[in-house]
Design a protein with these regions (language model features):
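Non-catalytic, surface beta->alpha helical segment in thiol-disulfide oxidoreductase systems
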Residues: 64-87
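Residues at alpha-helix caps and immediate loop-helix transition turns in enzyme cores, especially N-
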Residues: 16-17, 44, 74
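Thioredoxin-like thiol-disulfide oxidoreductase module
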Residues: 36-56, 83
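Structural micro-motif
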Residues: 52-63, 72-73
């Protein structure tokens, strides 16, 4: 499983998602992630909206194996369900 987290500095939900991904990387086989700082990379919410397929108002926006799954709480719920790991 490969997770991409699109976030920005100063976003507490981005930090939570990144911390959970880091924990999973250490505990779950075949799990890896990449954190993308949308400010540093020059990615706009309009750019993210194109990838997600609907208008994006918040970050983080998280993709699992290239499929958009939503934000931090969606990610936490999926990881708890699939791996029984909580943040």
């Amino acid at each position: 499983m490969f997770v991409v987290i699109f976030g920005r500095p100063g976003c507490p939900y981005c930090v939570r998602a990144k911390n959970l991904a880091e924990k999973l990387k250490g505990e779950v086989a075949n799990f890896d992630y990449r954190y993308v700082d949308i400010i540093a990379e020059g990615i706009s919410k309009a750019d993210l909206s194109k990838s997600v397929g609907k208008e994006v108002e918040t970050v983080p926006q998280i993709f699992i194996d290239e499929k958009p799954i939503g934000g931090c709480t969606d990610f936490e719920a999926l990881m708890k369900e699939q791996f029984h790991v909580v943040a």
